[in-house]
């Protein structure tokens, strides 16, 4: 079974996207507060608002349970969130409908705390819609890709695709000239998700190390790399187990 369709992962991602820092960060480790709210920070810190036209249109690929899509709606009048997981999209649609996320935070074993967290009231949820779709085959989804987007946001996606290069090759047609592409990834290349032959980086080529950022620059000739930034993030599994990672965020402008 796809792990992203399980109750466990849906609950963990709702917590990851919608919980307050105090609900995620373990007591006594205040320095980890900066690793919370990743779905918000990947937009708030990386979106180049001065480059946005009026009535900007955004595509959030691999939106998971949707918090980054709602954050994009602060600045864009239309936002389409797309994810391969039907459960994630159902959860995102439920938040859009109600204005809040309900989920259980695992404490230990079957012990859990029920939480309900509201979206900020100033976010216009009507600007956002969610669709299931395959990031590697966006042309077959129900979104209007031919109209182009002023922003494409893909957070922690590329190292979970079986063929990330196929996703990258769609981007020139997706992003309007002058539009921006926001990518984040910890570059955790694993054969569980991506055959090694399809990794973008993390290997030697003719005895020379190849990094993912270097490969992105090679594979995105229609884009200008504007900036990069390290964005730490924290995923809480239960009260005594956490995943701490550092994503590299990069912003690219369509030539």
Regions found by a protein language model. Give the residues of each.
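Conserved alpha-helix/loop element of class I SAM-dependent methyltransferases that forms part
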Residues: 32-55
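Conserved class I S-adenosyl-L-methionine
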Residues: 55-64, 80
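Conserved SAM/SAH-binding beta-strand->alpha-helix loop
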Residues: 85
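S-adenosyl-L-methionine
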Residues: 94-140
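Conserved Class I S-adenosyl-L-methionine
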Residues: 108, 194-228
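A short acidic, Gly/Pro-enriched loop at the edge of an enzyme's catalytic core
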Residues: 136-152
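A short glycine-rich, Lys/Arg-flanked "PGG" loop and its adjoining helix->strand segment in the class I
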Residues: 165-177
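Conserved beta-strand signature within the Rossmann-like core of class I S-adenosyl-L-methionine
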Residues: 178-186
């Amino acid at each position: 079974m796809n792990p992203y369709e399980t109750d466990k992962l849906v609950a963990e991602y709702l917590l990851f996207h919608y919980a307050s820092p105090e609900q995620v960060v373990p007591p006594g480790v205040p320095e980890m507060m900066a690793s919370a709210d990743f779905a918000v920070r990947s937009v708030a810190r990386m979106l180049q608002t001065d480059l946005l036209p009026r009535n900007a249109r955004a595509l959030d690929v691999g939106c998971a349970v949707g918090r980054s899509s709602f954050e994009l709606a602060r600045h864009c009048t239309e936002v389409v969130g797309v994810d391969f997981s039907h459960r994630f999209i159902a959860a995102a649609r439920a938040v859009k409908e109600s204005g809040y996320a309900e989920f259980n935070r695992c404490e230990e074993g079957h012990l859990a705390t029920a939480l309900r967290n509201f979206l900020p009231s100033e976010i216009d949820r009507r600007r956002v819609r969610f669709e299931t779709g395959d990031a590697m085959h966006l042309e077959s989804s129900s979104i209007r890709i031919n109209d182009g987007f002023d922003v494409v946001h893909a957070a922690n996606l590329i190292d979970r695709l079986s063929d990330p290069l196929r996703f990258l090759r769609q981007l020139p047609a997706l992003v309007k000239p002058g539009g921006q592409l926001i990518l984040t990834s910890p570059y955790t290349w694993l054969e569980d998700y991506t055959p090694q032959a399809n990794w973008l980086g993390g290997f030697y080529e003719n005895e020379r190390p190849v990094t993912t950022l270097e490969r992105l620059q090679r594979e995105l000739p229609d884009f200008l790399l504007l900036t990069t930034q390290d964005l730490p993030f924290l995923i809480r599994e239960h009260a005594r187990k956490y995943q701490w990672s550092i994503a590299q965020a990069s912003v690219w402008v369509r030539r």
